[in-house]
From Swiss-Prot:
Keywords of this entry: Cytoplasm, Disease variant, DNA damage, DNA repair, Fanconi anemia, Nucleus, Phosphoprotein
Protein name, per record: Fanconi anemia group A protein
Primary location group: nucleus
Assembly and interaction partners: Belongs to the multisubunit FA complex composed of FANCA, FANCB, FANCC, FANCE, FANCF, FANCG, FANCL/PHF9 and FANCM. The complex is not found in FA patients. In complex with FANCF, FANCG and FANCL, but not with FANCC, nor FANCE, interacts with HES1; this interaction may be essential for the stability and nuclear localization of FA core complex proteins. The complex with FANCC and FANCG may also include EIF2AK2 and HSP70. Interacts with FAAP20/C1orf86; interaction is direct.
Example of a GO cellular component annotation carried by this entry: nucleoplasm
Substitution effect: S1088F: In FANCA; benign
Sequence motif: Nuclear localization signal, positions: 18-34
Physiological role: DNA repair protein that may operate in a postreplication repair or a cell cycle checkpoint function. May be involved in interstrand DNA cross-link repair and in the maintenance of normal chromosome stability.
Positions of modified residues (Phosphoserine): S1449
Annotated disease: Fanconi anemia, complementation group A: A disorder affecting all bone marrow elements and resulting in anemia, leukopenia and thrombopenia. It is associated with cardiac, renal and limb malformations, dermal pigmentary changes, and a predisposition to the development of malignancies. At the cellular level it is associated with hypersensitivity to DNA-damaging agents, chromosomal instability (increased chromosome breakage) and defective DNA repair.
Entry keyword annotation includes DNA repair: yes
A biological process term (GO) from this entry: protein-containing complex assembly
């Protein structure tokens, strides 16, 4: 008490003027008055009231103790800066004084001390200070409070303090009580927050007080003050206590308090804060306003660091579930009809970021199944706020990949319930949920159009069970019409429900209603774009603008698939008004056409070929383009640069990518990554101008030009931004954590790219990896390698890629695409491939270290892992050594992401890594001998990283030390040299059949296989085959020959059997190319491969000879011969081998004669080939023979000499010598000689044929026919076509003059031992098939009498005519059509149509003149070909049935 409370005139002052103490006054009164117990009790109560009303303990002590207690000032106890603090007085002294005072007053010491401390707390909170922070203490106040609480702890420890009384006293000063002071009391154990709150008499008031203070605290935290740490700790403690006490099933409350109060208060406070935040967001809170700061801070309490110390997850889950319920149900002001109209504005990207951040924090604790189940429960039991419900659905499908299936299942149940009992609520919910999820794009959920078609577009639809269900569906759809967006109405009209015919009126009524609504909205269903987007902000796009977007998208789909999009084809039929009026004009905009046709030109031409562009419109377009080319200046002026409308979206995309990158290094921001990726997806769509529903784009296979990848500028910029961002994000994330602890950001990022721009991303990757790889920096290599891994992770959801040549024609999965993009040809490409493979494999092993090897391998193609092994063997000699257990190394991703990455060290570390060594045990990723050969064949020696010597040493090691001894199960050869040669030859053939071998050569005939890079491999093959030949000589006993098939011919036979048979151009070219490669390989190997090493009398024709003869007869005759002869190289090679083998026998001359005699029947083409090349072949054979034998050439070789000499003499002016035997050989020699002589010198010499033998003339006529057909078939033939005609005509004239039958040449069969077997083995099959063409080409030279005289002539003529017609129908006569400029010269004889016409007229005139016996076999001819020409067939049948007519002389002449 102060001194002013004691009046001067009172009796408290003695006569001497001394002022008496209050104790003396009280004592005096006690002495004067008689003790009264009742009065004493009242006095005690009054004293307590007085003490509670006036809590100035300092004054009280002064009054009680007098001058001695002036030093007992409590203000000095709590004043930490006072030099007198605790100098003379301890807590025990003050406590003793309090006890004394309490005993004098008759008041419990706990009550007295509680009132004193509460008063001091109030004084500290109201002390003048920088009170800009209404909930936090200043530094000075905090120090004073700390001292006071130490004193209070002493009192508590000595049972001198009443908590309940203290709480009651505190609430009396509630207006001045600061929240931080309450927190300190709680933290230091003076009084818990629970006790304090439950002591308040008014629960609503205390909730309001806490709410106000928490709002102030949140605002204070967002202000970034110097006390932020304290504020953050306060908020965390309060929220944790609220959650534990409010959402714990069995609250551990004290017996002295009511157990219901605390949960009520805490739940009330939490609910007040959430409702305040939701209302603020609904009202449109301003950015950086105080309210915005409060909401942002409060939503932050749902993160892990705020609630991290909550041990049990059950209260936390109950709290989050309760919060979600409040979010979904608070203030349900919107109706379902409002949701139908407005839900497009509630997509994830358009929802307020604060609300989406709250959703994401709730998702951390609750699984997708729990969230969907909770949403279902809330919708079934309570009124909801549709905006927040649907924005929650959007967040759910964006953040949880598995949510799509969960929502689909739930919607399916809703639809089943709706149609089962006509529940309108279930129907509305299902439609709203599906539409909302579809707004988030194809990577999150299927499109609404696809869902609607799947649900109602078939007989299995929900509506197909009964008429009641149909009526319910169309009633529902009709009720939606006034609220529907035009987009949804268009979907319902274009993809209507499947309805039985008898209920068709229900559908037509609805469509009429929907079209009326669209008309009211001034939207035409005919003008709807081909690629519509139901999530676009606007209701409708102008038809012209939509058409431009449709054209761009259609061209993009065409470019990536190579086919006209199905959407365009459907529009050309079912939506023709829009297609003709808008799409085609937008597509056919006149422009200066590029010199190299681009995708737009190719697309237009494809539509033109498909008759999808009206001729008049196409003609107008071509004229306009021509006019633009003629006036380039005007065209340039007319083409204005489009306003760069993509700049703003591009900037927004850049900003969104920057925000994502900033989150990479902040662990606290991990929960916002999925939202940021969703925003990036939205920004990306805006940049690319994709206003279509991406999921409706029918890209089942991506078409990618691997050699000339091209991108539109807008796509190029967007994809570069994405790839750069991915690489930067990876580097940023790797600086903080290894790949396995970086979270799902990369997978989410890649999924966004796959959903929006996968074709463009793959095209850009093709440009970077295949064409610019060596110039990429280390961060780019690492980033793109990680991207490849994550694309492989999503392989099952990605379409295949058709890269065209040089890759196989079949579609490739995306991981295998990277194998095609990484080439190993030059030094630079080898080292780049090593870097990329090292980075990709290392990242995969780190990222999925806790998963199985199957998962590791599934993310990368086996080809990429094999290339890494190939490069390690090739570039590092250390890798060729076997590994020991001590060599096994650990793998770290960290050195790779550093700027100065040591790739060699990283590669060797990966090579010796234990897990990688385990992966290599998998059969499909282990580098085999065949894999090694395919990769080695691609190396360009002139640009190789190895020198010639190093490359040779490497080949020797790889073949003889590594793959040859390795087991076949591990990809080796089991030590079998022949198996090694077989695999090598197959690899050579495979490589040269693929177009990879022609990438760098204009003319594939210049070098072996079009490449010089194979020479070293061919040298290894030569060495290995030479070794095999030596082994064979050692194995076969003297006097015997090997009987088994040579492995090379076995390879050729198997490969030829696998090729497509037939006479199509493609099959023929493929077979010809294969045979040319066989021939080149044979020419590089010893000639003994063709004939064997020696001939023996017991078995003169070796198995190898037989195999070579078969190869010549069956294949080379058709594809490797020209004009009846093989090429010079293979012919000379055979004869060299023949002499070598024969010279090793006992009688070389006899062996040569025997073999060549057998050739006449087994392989005559070899002899005709020798005749052609004899001038160059003879000196070589003669020199070799004379070197080993003194005798003249063997007789069969002399026959070849004589045949050539006869031909030369025949064409000389002198008299010709008689033709040697055999006749066919002399005829062949004469034919080849005639081909070398000019036409004017031939006519006179051919008159000598009258003196030649009949058989020679017949053979010569056949060879001439072959020459005639060759002249037709070969455009650059050295034989002039008129000359070939004249030669054939001259020989035919001679035959007719001498009445020699030649018709058998057009009826050759293998059973004909005299002509057929011989000539059919010389002429290619194509020539014999075209004999009908040759027959009727000589029609004008047929003799009239011979045609009637020869009984077989009509049969042959009809047979040739029917075969000619069949050839024409099959298109085979196109190969013999004359080149331009020659048809006039040939007088129409080479034109198939004219030829057939003349042949037909000839037969119709011939048939009536032929005798009855000529028709004996007509029925056989017409049995299966009578329908080729009904008129000719009828004439034949009519003449066959008629009686012989004696007056045949009245018929007109045929010739």
């Amino acid at each position: 008490m102060s001194d002013s409370w004691v009046p001067n005139s009172a009796s408290g002052q003695d006569p001497g003027g001394r002022r008496r103490a209050w104790a003396e006054l009280l004592a005096g009164r006690v002495k004067r008055e008689k003790y009264n117990p009742e009065r004493a009790q009242k006095l005690k109560e009054s004293a307590v009231r007085l003490l509670r009303s006036h809590q100035d303990l300092n004054a009280l002590l002064l009054e009680v103790e007098g001058p001695l207690c002036k030093k007992l000032s409590l203000s000095k106890v709590i004043d930490c800066d006072s030099s007198e603090a605790y100098a003379n007085h301890s807590s025990s002294f003050i406590g003793s004084a309090l006890q004394d005072q309490a005993s004098r007053l008759g008041v419990p010491v706990g009550i007295l001390s509680a009132g004193m401390v509460a008063s001091s707390v109030g004084q500290i909170c109201t002390a003048p200070a920088e009170t800009s922070h209404p909930v936090l203490l200043t530094v000075e106040q905090r120090k004073k409070l700390s001292s006071l609480l130490e004193f209070a702890q002493y009192l508590l420890a000595h049972s001198m303090f009443s908590r309940l009384s203290f709480c009651q006293e505190l609430w009396k000063i509630q207006s001045s009580l600061l929240l931080e002071a309450v927190w300190h009391l709680h933290v230091q154990g003076i009084v818990s927050l629970q006790e304090l709150l439950e002591s308040h008499p008014d629960m609503h008031a205390v909730g309001s007080w806490l709410f106000r203070n928490l709002c102030c605290l949140c605002e204070q935290m967002e202000a970034s003050c110097q006390h932020a740490d304290v504020a953050r700790a306060m908020l965390s403690d309060f929220v944790q206590m609220f959650v534990l006490r409010g959402f714990q099933k069995n609250s551990d409350l004290r017996r002295t308090v009511e157990p219901e109060k605390m949960p009520q208060v805490t739940v009330d406070v939490l609910q007040r804060m959430l409702i305040f935040a939701l209302d603020a967001l609904a009202a449109g809170v301003q950015e950086e306003s105080s309210t915005h700061k409060i909401v942002r801070c409060w939503f932050g309490v749902f993160s892990g660091h705020t609630l991290g110390s909550v041990i049990s997850t059950d209260p936390l889950k109950r709290f989050f579930s309760h919060t979600l319920t409040q979010i979904l149900t608070h203030s349900p002001v919107l109706k379902a009809s409002d949701a139908v109209q407005m839900q497009r504005e509630w997509s994830f990207a358009r929802t307020h970021p604060l609300l989406t951040s709250l959703y994401r924090r709730l998702f951390v604790m609750l699984s997708a199944e729990e969230l969907v189940g909770h949403l279902q429960e809330v919708l079934e039991t309570q009124e909801v706020h549709w905006q927040r419900v649907l924005s929650f659905v959007s967040a759910l499908v964006v953040c949880f990949p598995e949510a799509q299936q969960l929502l689909e299942d739930w919607v399916a149940r809703l639809m089943a319930q709706a149609f089962e009992s006509c529940q309108l609520d279930s129907m509305v919910t299902a439609f709203l949920v599906v539409r909302q999820a579809a707004l988030e794009g194809p990577s999150a959920f299927l499109s609404y159009a696809d869902w609607f078609k799947a649900s109602f577009g078939s007989t299995r639809g929900y509506h197909g069970c009964s008429k009641k269900a149909l009526v319910f569906l169309f009633t529902f759809l009709s009720e939606l019409v006034p609220f529907e967006s035009p987009r949804y109405l268009q979907v319902h009209i274009l993809h209507p429900p499947l309805v039985p015919g008898k209920y068709r009126s229900l559908l037509t009524d609805y469509i009429s209603l929907a079209k009326t609504r669209l008309a009211d909205l001034k939207v035409s269903i005919e003008n709807m774009g081909l690629y519509e987007d139901l999530s676009s902000a606007g209701d409708i796009t102008e038809p012209h603008s939509q058409a431009l977007q449709d054209v761009e998208k259609a061209i993009m789909v065409f470019e990536h698939t190579g086919n006209i999009p199905v959407t365009v084809m459907e529009a050309s039929i079912f939506r023709r008004p829009y297609y003709v009026s808008h799409f085609l004009p937008a597509l056919l905009t006149p422009r200066v056409l590029p010199k190299v046709p681009d995708s737009r030109v190719a697309f237009i031409e494809s539509l033109k070929r498909a008759d999808k562009i009206p001729p008049s419109l196409y003609s107008t377009y071509c004229q306009a383009c021509s006019a633009a080319e003629e006036k380039p200046e005007d065209a340039a002026l007319g083409v204005r640069a489009e306003p760069n409308s993509a700049e703003e979206p591009l900037g927004q995309l850049t900003a969104a990518l920057g925000e994502l990158r900033a989150s990479m290094t902040d662990p606290s921001q991990r929960d916002v990554i999925s939202a940021q990726v969703a925003v990036i997806s939205e920004r990306l769509r805006a940049v690319l101008g994709h206003n279509e529903d991406d999921s409706s784009v029918e890209i089942s296979k991506i078409q990618l030009s691997i050699n000339t990848p091209r991108l539109e500028p807008r796509e190029h910029m967007a994809v570069d931004l994405l790839l750069t961002s991915f690489c930067q994000n990876l580097m940023a994330a790797s600086s903080v954590a290894p790949p396995e602890r970086q979270g799902p950001w990369a997978a989410l990022f890649v999924r966004t790219m796959c959903g929006r721009v996968l074709p463009a991303v793959l095209t850009r990757l093709c440009q970077l990896l295949r064409h610019q790889g060596p110039s990429l920096s280390a961060p780019h290599v690492l980033g793109l390698a990680a991207l490849a891994v994550h694309l492989g992770e999503s392989r099952s959801a990605l379409p295949e890629v058709d890269v065209g040549p040089p890759a196989p024609g079949a579609g490739l999965p995306v991981p295998a695409l990277f194998d095609s993009l990484l080439t190993c040809r030059t030094r630079d490409s080898l080292f780049f491939c090593l870097k990329f493979c090292t980075a990709a494999i290392s990242y995969s092993l780190c990222k999925f270290s806790s998963q199985s090897r199957d998962t590791l391998c599934s993310c990368l193609s086996p080809g990429l892992i094999k290339k890494f092994q190939f490069l390690m063997f090739r570039l590092f000699s250390e890798a060729r050594q076997p590994l020991s257990e001590e060599d096994v190394a650990s793998l770290s991703w960290r050195p790779l992401h550093l700027p100065s990455a040591d790739w060699q060290r990283a590669a060797l570390s990966l090579w010796t890594h234990r897990t990688f060594r385990e992966v290599l045990k998998e059969e499909d990723v282990h580098l085999t001998y065949q894999d090694w050969l395919h990769l080695e064949l691609e190396i360009q020696p002139e640009a190789d990283a190895l020198s010639d010597t190093e490359r040779q040493d490497f080949h020797q090691w790889a073949i003889h030390e590594h793959f040859l001894p390795e087991s076949s199960a591990s990809g080796g050869c089991d030590g079998d040299l022949q198996a090694a040669c077989t695999i090598l030859v197959n690899a050579l053939m495979d490589f040269h059949q693929s177009s990879r071998s022609y990438d760098h050569s204009e003319n594939s005939d210049l070098v072996f296989g079009g490449r010089t890079g194979n020479e070293d491999i061919i040298s290894r093959l030569q060495e290995m085959v030479a070794d095999l030949e030596l082994q064979q000589d050692l194995i076969v006993p003297l006097g015997h020959t090997p009987s088994q098939e040579h492995f090379l011919f076995e390879i050729f036979r198997r490969r030829l059997q696998a090729l497509t048979s037939g006479w199509s151009v493609a099959a023929s070219l493929q077979r010809q190319r294969e045979l040319l490669m066989y021939k080149r390989i044979l020419l590089r190997l010893p000639s003994s491969v063709l004939c064997g090493s020696s001939f023996q009398a017991e078995q003169p024709i070796t198995a190898r000879c037989e195999q070579f003869f078969h190869l010549v007869n069956s294949e080379m005759r058709n594809f490797c011969s020209h004009g009846g002869a093989l090429t010079q190289d293979i012919t000379a090679h055979f004869f060299r081998g023949l002499l070598n083998a024969c010279l090793r026998s006992r009688d070389p001359s006899l062996m040569v004669d025997f073999i060549l005699a057998k050739c006449q029947t087994k392989c005559p083409l070899i002899l005709t080939s020798a005749l052609v090349w004899w001038p160059s072949l003879e000196p070589v054979l003669l020199c070799r023979w004379r070197r080993h034998c003194q005798s003249p050439l063997p007789r069969e070789l002399q026959k070849l000499q004589e045949g050539r000499q006869f031909a030369s003499d025949f064409l000389s002016p002198e008299a010709a010598s008689p033709a040697p035997n055999p006749d066919w050989l002399s005829a062949a020699a004469l034919h080849f000689a005639i081909q070398q002589v000019r036409e004017e010198n031939i006519r006179k010499q051919l008159k000598k044929l009258d003196c030649e033998r009949e058989e020679l003339l017949v053979f010569l006529f056949f060879f001439s026919l072959m020459g005639l057909l060759s002249s037709h078939l070969t455009s650059n033939s050295t034989t002039d076509l008129p000359k070939a005609f004249h030669v054939c005509a001259a020989i035919l004239e001679c035959l007719e003059k001498r009445k020699i039958s030649w018709l058998a040449l057009f009826q050759l069969t293998e059973s004909d031992l005299r002509l057929g077997r011989l000539l059919l083995r010389v002429a290619p099959d194509q020539h014999t098939r075209l004999l009908p063409f040759a027959f009727y080409s000589l029609l004008s030279y047929f003799h009239e009498d011979a045609a009637i005289r020869e009984e077989a002539f009509l049969h042959v003529a009809v047979d040739m005519y029917l075969k000619l017609v069949q050839l024409f129908v099959a298109g085979d006569t196109s190969t013999v059509s004359p080149p331009a400029g020659r048809s006039l010269e040939l007088k129409g004889q080479g034109n198939p149509v004219e030829l057939i016409t003349k042949a037909r007229l000839f037969l119709l005139q011939l048939i009536p003149r032929c005798p009855k016996k000529s028709f004996s076999h007509v029925a056989e001819l017409l049995a299966d070909r009578g329908d080729c020409d009904p008129e000719v067939s009828a004439a034949l049948q009519s003449r066959q049935q008629a009686a012989p007519d004696a007056d045949l002389s009245q018929e007109p002449h045929l010739f």
